[in-house]
Amino acid sequence: MTQTNFRSGPDANGLFGSFGGRYVAETLMPLVLDLNREYEAAKADPEFIKEMAYFQRDYIGRPNPLYFAERLTEFCGGAKIYFKREELNHTGAHKINNCIGQVLLAKRMGKKRLIAETGAGMHGVATATVAARFGLPCVIYMGATDIERQQANVFRMKLLGAEIVPVTSGTGTLKDAMNEALRDWVTNVDDTFYLIGTVAGPHPYPAMVRDFQSVIGKETKEQMQEKEGRLPDSLIACVGGGSNAMGLFHPFLDDASVEIIGVEAGGHGVDTDKHAASLNGGVPGVLHGNRTYLLQDNDGQITDAHSISAGLDYPGIGPEHAYLHEVKRVEYVSITDEEALDAFHQCCLLEGIIPALETAHALAEAMKRATNLRDDHLMVVCLSGRGDKDMQTVMNHMAAADNTQEKLV
C-alpha cells in the first residue's frame, strides 16, 4: 500500500479505479446527470449545509456518543473497545443520516414522490420517516422473504404512511427489491426521487451516500481525540452494500496508522454457496448501475446471497469498497451466521445493548481481534443499528437450537 491519497475519488465519470460508473437506461441518464449537478451545487451552498446541520442536530440527535465498552473489553482481555453509537439515532440506525440528505436534495429538485428499496427495513423506515416529515408520498420496495422476517419494521413503515410493495421475484430479498425500485424510477422519472440506501447504484449515489454518512467518521475522529488524545488504532464495521462502513472509514482513509477492517456476511461459510461475501467470494461485474464485486456463476448470472441478517443479504458491494479492497487499504473479512449470533448474545449480556444482527458481524470480528492485541490498542466498532427488528429471527434460531438452555445459563 504505497498510495497516500485514498479520498480523492470518484473521478468525473464516477469511477473509483475501475469500479463504479453509470450503467443506466437511456431514459435515466439525464436524471442521473441532473442529480449530480444538483448535488455538487448543494455541497457548495451554505444554506443546504446549514439545513443539514439543523436536521442532524435537532431531528437525528447528533452527535451520538463514542462509548467505551468496558465489560466487553474486560471479557476479551486485550484492546480497548469503543462503540460508535449509531443505533441511538432517530429510527435506530445509521440510515437516517443519508435519508435526511437525500430528501433535502429531492426537495431542492422539486420532486414530489419518494421511492426506496429496503432489506432489513431500517432504510425503509428512515425513508418513510423523512417522507412523513416533508409531506411526500413514499413507496418502499421490499422482498417478500424480508417482509416475513422483518414484520416489526414493515408495521413501522405503514404507521409512517408508506406504501409497501412486496417483491416476489428471485429470492424475494434486497437485490430483487432494488430491481423493482429501478423499474419504478424509469417509469416515473419526472416526478420521482429514488432514495438509494447504500453506497451502490449509478454515480453520484455511491459518493453522495458516502458523504452523507461520513458524519460517523468525522465525529469519531473528534471524540477519540477528546477521550484518548489520539487517533484510534483500528476501525471495524459490517459491510453489506457498505454505507455505515464507508461513513466510518472515509475520514480515516489517509491516516496510514489506522487499520481498517470491513466485515462481510459469511453465512454458512464462504466455501459454501450460502453467504453474502462479495469481496471474499465474488468477482467483478455490473449490477444496479455500477461495476463492483458480485456473487456470480460461471455464466455471469447473479447468484443468491445468504445471511441471517437481512441487511447484509445482498450479492454485491459498493464500488468504493471494491476499490479499497483492490488497493489493499481496507482488509475485508467474513463472519458466519453462528459467529454473529454468539457476538449478539455477548453484547446483550456484557453491555446491556441489543445490537442489530448486521452489527453483530462487526462485533464478532472485533472480539476475535481484541483478544490478541495490547491493552493500549484503541478499537472502534460501528454499532450501526439496534436489534429490535431481529427479535423474531433470534427467537426462531434459539428455538431451533438443541442446546438453547445451556447457552443461556
From Swiss-Prot:
Its cofactor is pyridoxal 5'-phosphate. InterPro entries: Trp_synth_b_CS (IPR006653), Trp_synth_beta (IPR006654), Trp_synth_beta/beta-like (IPR023026), TrpB-like_PALP (IPR001926), TrpB-like_PALP_sf (IPR036052). It catalyses: (1S,2R)-1-C-(indol-3-yl)glycerol 3-phosphate + L-serine = D-glyceraldehyde 3-phosphate + L-tryptophan + H2O. Pfam families: PALP. It comes from the Bacteria. The modification N6-(pyridoxal phosphate)lysine is found at K95. One of its GO terms (molecular function) is tryptophan synthase activity. Pathway: Amino-acid biosynthesis; L-tryptophan biosynthesis; L-tryptophan from chorismate: step 5/5. Keywords: Amino-acid biosynthesis, Aromatic amino acid biosynthesis, Lyase, Pyridoxal phosphate, Tryptophan biosynthesis. One of its GO terms (cellular component) is cytoplasm. Its EC number is 4.2.1.20. The beta subunit is responsible for the synthesis of L-tryptophan from indole and L-serine. Tetramer of two alpha and two beta chains. Belongs to the TrpB family. This is Tryptophan synthase beta chain. The lineage of its organism: Bacteria, Pseudomonadati, Pseudomonadota, Gammaproteobacteria, Pseudomonadales. The gene is trpB.
